[in-house]
């Protein structure tokens, strides 16, 4: 048992660079470096408390657990597997060389008890940890990890509502944390201005420093004046505004201000830790959360109700309005906003056709720490996918505009067939010495076959299977069987306790033949489960993709 439970430590963690190993092989060095990278001060939101992003999404349960995970990974043999239970290393077992080196289960609760109240009780007793999606699965790469998905969403919204041209238009949103911090840059890359409301000045400062947001307004009038000037000039400039969205959005409605798109990425999924009630300071919010959690949750949800009502008002004006996956509609509905779900989530509105083809947030990181390794892989992607101008444009913009946070990394939305092709090519680049050290390949849990989340990724499935969570379980089992380097199974990411189950996968390209065999299996099977899941739900795009790719789906393709 863990006898102490230290959640704060005044220390700076950074992943090692170069080719010298702390562990016994690259297959255990990789999770070690990526765990540390999750807590890099340039990556994590609150690394001294082990918080990576998303409210209280942690990399380890407490600092004692972190130390023991590090020590265990350093000494793990090539035929052993470490088991991690909600951020705590609980066992090392003999497996085999093609088995995962780490298996992770975070935040999972029996459904009847799967709520924030019970989870917070367990968390207070150091019996559980909220892993979010990539925080507790050690593959967070900073805000870049969601930039392309947000960019693709804005671009598709532009296609649907504005004939594919966002020049001279602007997005209204809130939240500049680990996920929401991607919004201003994504809007700029898509050609739009954006007004980004954030209640913590430190988060604004972080996004300004990393060039995810361009400038900060002094007040609402100044922000609107800047928006007016830049949209008239056709410039895509992102503006941060310090304040509370639950106050500012209703005021914009009152003034009759009309954005061109409205969404939100505050941490509304976690009312106790992630959404500031109207009229409160952040310090007051954190202090009262410890002393009167029920009252704090109530106050936060009441503010969310005001926020969502304003979003509904914008929708009534004819402004394209959508939820970006933080469960704010659910929170508002619980506070009496009966029609909170009148505006759609971003997946059914804009992203699902990509999921039907297994296309999702494929990402990789250079364990060397050398940016040149990423630039070389960028070039390889262009070489292997020569005709995708949209993808090439994304890679060019990413290199120009996205600052690396921690270990250099890249995200690139590709699907079934191409993921394995790229992974095998990266492995050959390591083998030949073109890359200076191995590459890790992973993805967000927000992917086509790895999540059940009725208020987000699986919202409004055409067969009504929104809440069926067999699919992420099958995904995790298959990736384990295929030989991924580490596999994770989480609950509550993105939308909070009781509303999602999801799985993650990471695989190492170390240049060996054995790695190539594992890569071919895992990077084919993983996106194929997404095609399978959507084909099973009856989506023609997915059924056709399954047939084209030769998937063996007994009830569909045989």
UniProtKB/Swiss-Prot annotation:
Active site residues according to the UniProt entry: 412
Keyword Cytoplasm: yes
GO BP term, pick one: L-histidine catabolic process to glutamate and formamide
Gene3D superfamilies: Urocanase like domains, Urocanase superfamily
Pathway participation: Amino-acid degradation; L-histidine degradation into L-glutamate; N-formimidoyl-L-glutamate from L-histidine: step 2/3
Cellular component per GO, a single term: cytoplasm
Leader sequence segment: none
Main location: cytoplasm
Binding site for NAD(+): 54-55, 132, 178-180, 198, 244-245, 265-269, 275-276, 324, 494
UniProt xrefs under InterPro entries: Urocanase (IPR055351), Urocanase-like (IPR023637), Urocanase_C (IPR035401), Urocanase_central_sf (IPR038364), Urocanase_CS (IPR023636), Urocanase_N (IPR035400), Urocanase_Rossmann-like (IPR035085), Urocanase_sf (IPR036190)
Co-factor: note: Binds 1 NAD(+) per subunit.
HAMAP family assigned to the protein according to its UniProt record, in alphabetical order: HutU
Protein name, as recorded: Urocanate hydratase
Gene: hutU
């Amino acid at each position: 048992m863990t006898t102490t439970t230290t959640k704060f430590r005044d220390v700076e963690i950074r992943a090692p660079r170069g080719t010298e190993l702390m562990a016994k092989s690259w297959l255990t060095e990789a999770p070690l470096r990526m765990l540390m990278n999750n807590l890099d001060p340039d990556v994590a939101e609150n690394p001294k408390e082990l918080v990576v992003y998303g409210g209280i999404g942690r990399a380890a349960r407490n600092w004692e657990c972190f130390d023991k995970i590090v020590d265990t990974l350093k000494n793990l043999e090539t035929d052993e597997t470490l088991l991690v239970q909600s951020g705590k290393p609980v066992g090392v077992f003999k497996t085999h060389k093609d088995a995962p080196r780490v298996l992770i289960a975070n935040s999972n609760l029996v459904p009847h008890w799967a709520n924030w109240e019970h989870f917070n009780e367990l968390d207070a007793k150091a019996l559980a940890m909220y892993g979010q999606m990539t925080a507790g699965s050690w593959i967070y790469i900073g805000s870049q990890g969601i930039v392309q998905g947000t960019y693709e969403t804005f671009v598709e919204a532009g296609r649907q509502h504005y004939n594919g041209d966002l020049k001279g238009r602007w997005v209204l949103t809130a939240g500049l944390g680990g996920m929401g911090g991607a919004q201003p840059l994504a809007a700029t890359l898509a050609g739009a201005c954006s007004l980004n409301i954030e209640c913590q000045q430190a988060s604004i400062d972080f996004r300004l420093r990393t060039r995810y947001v361009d400038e900060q307004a002094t007040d609402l009038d100044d922000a609107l004046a800047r928006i007016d000037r830049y949209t008239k000039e056709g410039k895509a400039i992102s503006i941060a505004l310090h304040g509370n969205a639950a106050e500012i959005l209703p005021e914009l409605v009152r003034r009759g201000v009309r954005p061109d798109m409205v969404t939100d990425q505050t941490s509304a999924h976690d009312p106790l830790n992630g959404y500031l009630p109207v009229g409160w300071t952040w310090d007051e919010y954190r202090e009262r959360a410890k002393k009167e959690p029920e009252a704090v949750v109530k106050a936060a949800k009441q503010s969310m109700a005001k926020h969502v009502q304003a979003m509904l008002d914008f929708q009534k004006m004819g402004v394209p309005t959508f939820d970006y996956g933080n469960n704010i509609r659910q929170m508002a509905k619980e506070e009496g906003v009966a029609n909170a779900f009148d505006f759609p989530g971003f997946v059914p509105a804009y992203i699902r056709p990509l999921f039907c083809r297994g296309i999702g947030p494929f990402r990789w990181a250079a364990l060397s720490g050398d940016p040149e390794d990423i630039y070389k892989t960028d070039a390889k992607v262009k070489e292997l996918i020569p005709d995708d101008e949209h993808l090439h444009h994304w890679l060019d913009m990413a290199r120009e505009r996205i600052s690396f946070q921690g270990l250099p990394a890249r995200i690139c939305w590709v699907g079934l067939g191409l993921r394995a092709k790229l992974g095998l090519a990266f492995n050959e680049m390591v083998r030949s010495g073109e890359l200076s050290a191995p590459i890790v390949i992973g993805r967000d849990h927000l992917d086509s076959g790895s999540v059940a989340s009725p208020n987000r990724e699986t919202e409004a499935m055409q067969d009504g299977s929104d809440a069926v969570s067999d699919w992420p379980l099958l995904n995790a089992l298959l990736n384990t069987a295929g030989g991924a380097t580490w596999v994770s199974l989480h609950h509550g990411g993105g939308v909070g306790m009781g509303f999602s189950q999801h799985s993650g996968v990471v695989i190492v390209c170390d240049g060996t033949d054995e790695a190539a065999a594992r890569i071919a299996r895992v990077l084919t099977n993983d996106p194929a489960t997404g095609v399978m899941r959507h084909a099973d739900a009856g989506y023609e795009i997915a059924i056709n993709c399954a047939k084209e790719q030769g998937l063996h789906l007994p009830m569909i393709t045989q």
